[in-house]
């Protein structure tokens, strides 16, 4: 039984595009999180909104970093 080489489900050409998109989305949610933290009064803060913004920003920036590494030739 011959081994079949692994091929990525996403073409290598799209790594920089995905890196850019995920980083932009992550920074947008991060900026929204920071602005909401600075402008909302302490009594009006909503923990679920804050956690949602932080989670989306964190996951998007993590995926963006992953694709930046892949685009740079560092295969993790």
From Swiss-Prot:
Q: A GO molecular function for this record?
A: oligosaccharyltransferase complex binding
**Cross-referenced InterPro entries:** TMEM258/Ost5 (IPR007915)
- Predominant localisation class: membrane
Q: Where in the cell is it found?
A: Membrane
Asked whether the keyword Protease is assigned, the reply is no
- Bilayer disposition of the protein: Multi-pass membrane protein
Family, per the entry? Belongs to the OST5 family.
**Protein name listed in UniProt:** Dolichyl-diphosphooligosaccharide--protein glycosyltransferase subunit OST5
Q: What is the originating organism of this protein?
A: Dictyostelium discoideum (Social amoeba)
């Amino acid at each position: 039984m011959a081994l079949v080489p692994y091929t990525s489900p996403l073409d290598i050409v799209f790594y920089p595009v995905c890196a850019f998109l995920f980083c932009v989305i992550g920074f947008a949610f991060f900026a929204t999180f920071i602005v909401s933290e600075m402008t909302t009064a302490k009594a009006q803060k909503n923990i679920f909104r804050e956690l949602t913004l932080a989670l989306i920003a964190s996951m998007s920036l993590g995926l963006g970093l992953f694709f930046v590494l892949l685009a740079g030739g560092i295969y993790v």
